[in-house]
Amino acid sequence: MTQNNPFVLAADIGGTHVTAALVDTNTWQVIDESTVRHSVNSHADAKSILSAWSVPFREVIRNRLAPATPLIGIAMPGPFDYENGISHMRYQDKYDNLYGMDIRMELAERIGAKGRNIRFINDAAAFLQGEVFAGRHNGSPKVLGITLGTGLGTAVWERGSNAMDADLWKTPYLDTNAEEHLVTRWFVRKASQHGIAVTGLRELLALRGTHAAIVANILTEYSSHLLHFIRFFSEKEATDRLIIGGNIAKAWDIFRSFNPTAFDRFHIRISQLGEHAALIGAAAQFA
């Protein structure tokens, strides 16, 4: 990143997709026309996953005249050794076949980039950092971030510091841990217990007309789990300021409606940046 070239090639790797785009570090804006999305099967073999991941990087470089040796910031789910680029993901229902691999080296070879120019950041930390860089913290000295999707992401930002992964997904809760009660597969399991097959929350919500009582019960229970976790996180970090994102957060108004008084005790903002937040946060590693 130089004065003449303020762009960083940023990517957000999720459980079902990878999105890459150029971020202008002068304005901290994503260059929308540079954005490339590519689906990925997180249960595929390692070679197939890495090949799928590399596609949007190469397309952005080819389509947008990014530098031949670009700076690359990647928002990556955990567990992951972010400093050394080694995947520790296992038993997460995604990317098990990458366990122990040097992702920095593998991607560098496929993209045609220099390994030293690739940096990784936890996806939840990237999300929160991006929201902060976009000015969404409203002057608060400390803000918590939660991402709800195929996994549970948590992060903490304090003024003067970068956002850090809070790593609370494995917090003991009920019969397992917090993540197992707050992510997409929870909705799949709960619906299955009622003889309903869905792939996630969106399909479940579409059944409210035909299975109103069942869907309402599932949503009510999820709302309770979410409130419990927000309360736990807030008390742990001694702040009531939170920003929540991820695909599940799009149904925030529904979850809040089951107990608005309890939720409104916290200052909660729902991300309006979407995946742009993680892209900006990934690029911010080079700020």
Regions inferred by a protein language model and the residue ranges of each:
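Adenine-nucleotide phosphate-binding core of ATP-dependent small-molecule kinases
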Residues: 39-65, 188-254, 258-260, 267-278
